[in-house]
């Protein structure tokens, strides 16, 4: 009888090139995405050793971290940022890699561009020098971030040295109630298992609540798997997956597509296959979630209160909570809905897709951004921007008093002009709330797009269900 295998096992086994006695593996990489921050030294290493990019057709380059989201005719003002983008373009040209320029409508955040272009396909291995590469796992691919030296290795050989991971399944049952989105589900998961809960694992997301998510929602969930410490996150492909991929520029066409779908339908976990760890969550019990502290595991319900260190017996945890409260400028026991906001950011590889902007627009429609709030709405790609404008979403945002920007990573991280000032507090749809993540001294609360829009309207963290 054939061994029962998980989805991860099937993809891993199909890509094994070699296994060493100590268990170290060499795996084949199907797709490689590169951006301006982690690729310069990798290309430089190739040049110094006289190597070529082994498979330029399997590599896609796009600048996203450093690009401005305001007037692009002025170029990039910060010299270091400008040099990184110029270097990526020069390297792509030199090594024959397709590069999506800033003036290309396809340009955007790397993890939004890949799926849009049909570069992301089920059953493939996908890497990028970026921690949120797990996003692509929503398509039933094995996708994970790698370091700069590994970027060079993949460019040169189209392979990667890896140790196999353990299997974890997170089953999300039930139907989410009003105001509860994919972002709330993944925040609740991280709040439950912690930022080290997934360490050493590849996580498969399963269950009714995951199946019911759109592809955009599944990407949001897989995107934040890394925040639970996991190597990657993935969802078995289904008819929603195939429909999303069909007709994309780089996806198979005609008979090749039908053949691909036949293979993709084999990409599921065999019934009875072994998982090293199992976690369950009932989505029907959730309300909208927020983070209160400086770690993605610092999650509470919007109806809840900020924790009180006095209630925590473990000294290390108590001190961590005290430090977070101090940095965040919060008092123990205060209501989540009493936390005032200065800036709202809707965008990023977590929530920068058309579905996210539709959800935000529903809240903004007929309302005004609070006078005390700056609201930045940043589409994840030029194609998302175009579609949002065709649907008139940009007009809703602008009429509400929000800023409709050009695509890029923007305020997700302090690598471009969009940054929090010291002491400013944001409601952000991004993925990390570390100290200084959005700017030195900035304070970040992670929320869904609808919750971010609600905060923009009221000037404080607000239960979107009340609007």
Swiss-Prot record:
Provide the GO biological process annotations. Answer: L-leucine biosynthetic process
| UniProt-listed Gene3D superfamilies | Aconitase, domain 3
Entry annotated with the keyword Amino-acid biosynthesis: yes
Q: Which reaction does it catalyse?
A: (2R,3S)-3-isopropylmalate = (2S)-2-isopropylmalate
Q: Where does [4Fe-4S] cluster bind?
A: 349, 409, 412
CDD domains (UniProt xref):
IPMI
Q: Name one GO molecular function term.
A: 3-isopropylmalate dehydratase activity
Which cofactor(s) does the record list?
Answer: [4Fe-4S] cluster
Cofactor binding mode and count? Binds 1 [4Fe-4S] cluster per subunit.
Keywords from the named record = 4Fe-4S, Amino-acid biosynthesis, Branched-chain amino acid biosynthesis, Iron, Iron-sulfur, Leucine biosynthesis, Lyase, Metal-binding
Xref: Pfam families: Aconitase (PF00330)
E.C. number, please?
Answer: 4.2.1.33
Residue segments, region Disordered: 422-443
Record's keyword annotation contains Metal-binding? yes
What highest taxon heads this organism's lineage?
Bacteria
Q: Which PANTHER family match?
A: 3-ISOPROPYLMALATE DEHYDRATASE, HOMOACONITASE, MITOCHONDRIAL-RELATED
Under the heading HAMAP family, the entry gives: LeuC_type1
Q: How does it assemble?
A: Heterodimer of LeuC and LeuD.
Query: Its family?
Result: Belongs to the aconitase/IPM isomerase family. LeuC type 1 subfamily.
Stated name of the protein: 3-isopropylmalate dehydratase large subunit
Q: Which gene encodes it?
A: leuC
